[in-house]
């Protein structure tokens, strides 16, 4: 399936690494996310700036000059520019500071509240399960456990094996 067809189906993806156009400004990166849209994207850009105020401050700065956490916010924002039904996040907090991690999780919750489905692969299992409606524990690529985020957090075997006790 062509990428534009996936976008038209409402799917958006934020990769873990190499997730911004480093030679473009923050705003140009966001505009790239809205490239296939036929409507006016300015309202969505403003929504992204409301979600990530630091991006508005840095909108004319090259994305290549940003910190890892700020780049992650640009990538997240660019994906939101497609107005997705489902947002897929690959390790959204990898390599970011604890403060940025907490902020990203808060923003994920905000996006989820708008009705966008979130499919996330995340190294910080405890925090991810804390916001998850549904969770899956994979071992060697196979589904080992599944349940609500709360069920998995409270499962003694999951806690011992995957959550540090």
Language model features with spans:
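ABC ATPase NBD coupling module
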Residues: 1-18, 22, 41-45, 57-60, ...
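Conserved ABC ATPase signature
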Residues: 62-66
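ABC ATPase C-loop
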Residues: 79-80
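Catalytic Walker B motif of ABC-type/P-loop ATPase nucleotide-binding domains
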Residues: 87-91
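Conserved catalytic motifs of ABC-family nucleotide-binding domains
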Residues: 83
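Helical segment within the ABC ATPase nucleotide-binding domain
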Residues: 102-114
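ABC-type ATPase nucleotide-binding domains, specifically the catalytic core motifs of the NBD
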Residues: 1-3, 26-43, 51-56, 147, ...
